[in-house]
């Protein structure tokens, strides 16, 4: 099973530490006017023009990506879904946070999908063996789907609001 990749915007000190002898020590994403360029570990870097992002562990991204209280992005990031265009999350941007909690939670959407109000996001099996569906009450694009807890299962869905 493949999962999307997430890259966090690197500070100047992180950029300096990301190279050794002109080669990348981490997987990097360079965003410039010419487009996106992914550099794997050991690739020759050359001259970097644009913003540099460092790949992070996707499953742990909810810890540093968003503020659950305010619903805003804490650190700029780029998510590369399995298919479709990249998703840019900018620091300070407001996002929708939707939580699914139950004995067994099965996500029904993938990162990059566009959802509208009423769309099923997850199937939830309760402790009483009932099947319930979590539906979206907003329209937007799925930017992140991640599991937070194992028992009971807890998933977080991050949606970027759709601009009308």
What kind of feature is each model-predicted range?
Residues 1-164:
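Well-ordered secondary-structure scaffolds
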């Amino acid at each position: 099973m493949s999962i999307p990749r997430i890259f966090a915007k690197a500070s100047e000190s992180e950029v300096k530490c990301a190279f050794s002898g002109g080669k990348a020590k981490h997987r990097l994403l360079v965003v410039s006017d010419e487009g996106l360029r992914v550099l794997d570990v050991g690739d020759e870097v050359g001259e970097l023009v644009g913003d540099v992002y460092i790949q992070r562990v996707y499953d742990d991204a909810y810890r540093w990506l968003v503020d659950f209280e305010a619903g805003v992005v804490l650190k700029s990031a780029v998510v590369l879904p399995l298919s479709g265009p990249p998703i840019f999350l900018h620091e300070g941007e407001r996002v929708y946070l939707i939580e699914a909690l139950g004995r067994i939670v099965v996500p029904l959407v993938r990162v990059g999908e566009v959802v509208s109000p009423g769309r099923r996001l997850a199937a939830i099996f309760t402790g009483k063996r009932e099947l319930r569906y979590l539906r979206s009450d907003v329209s937007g694009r799925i930017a992140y789907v991640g599991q937070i807890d194992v028992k009971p299962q807890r998933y977080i869905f991050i949606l970027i609001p759709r601009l009308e």
